[in-house]
């Protein structure tokens, strides 16, 4: 999609495809961890990852 198409339709690709996810804890749209349908921003994921069962190896 080119810039002219975005200007003509007035929407971004994420809105067209229905991918309007946001962080479940803080509502942030950027830096999302969407794997396994987690949908937490990376900052929130770091805070709760251990409680969710993820292990840090380094």
UniProtKB/Swiss-Prot annotation:
Residues 1-21 are annotated as: Disordered. It comes from the Archaea. The keyword Zinc applies. Disulfide bonds: none annotated. One of its GO terms (biological process) is cytoplasmic translation. Keywords: Metal-binding, Ribonucleoprotein, Ribosomal protein, RNA-binding, rRNA-binding, Zinc. Its cofactor is Zn(2+). Residues 9-21 have a biased composition (Basic and acidic residues). Part of the 30S ribosomal subunit. This is Small ribosomal subunit protein uS14.
